């Protein structure tokens, strides 16, 4: 099976944020954290890999040492739509950005690899625009037709010979 569609939230200010890696052996990056191999869910759960389509969430947080999410303004939540979505910052302050990648396509009896998780906190100014691309799950492999990868870079299901089927 292959990887799912990537999810991301982006603007020019995003760099050096915490990255999570599902089932990674090691990493040299100072901010890389590992997601537990046993922690994956079909719902968006912090620090867990995601089954199915991807997801994204933007939350305003307090400027205190706790960085707790607060309810005003309400968190913006983004499900998979198959296209890039836009968010306009409604209040200047610190925001927590969370994204979950989509699951890859499957090839019976194996399920596609689950999507990863990433988060970061960033200061944003009212009126700034963020662009959100939530990954789509890769389609299952069938013997009759080649499957398609998910939206935003997702992998297709099935095992193929790369030299005879370049992507």
At which residue positions do the language-model features occur?
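Histidine- and aromatic-enriched segments that form or immediately flank copper-ligand environments
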Residues: 101-119
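C-terminal, surface-exposed recognition/capping segments
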Residues: 2-54
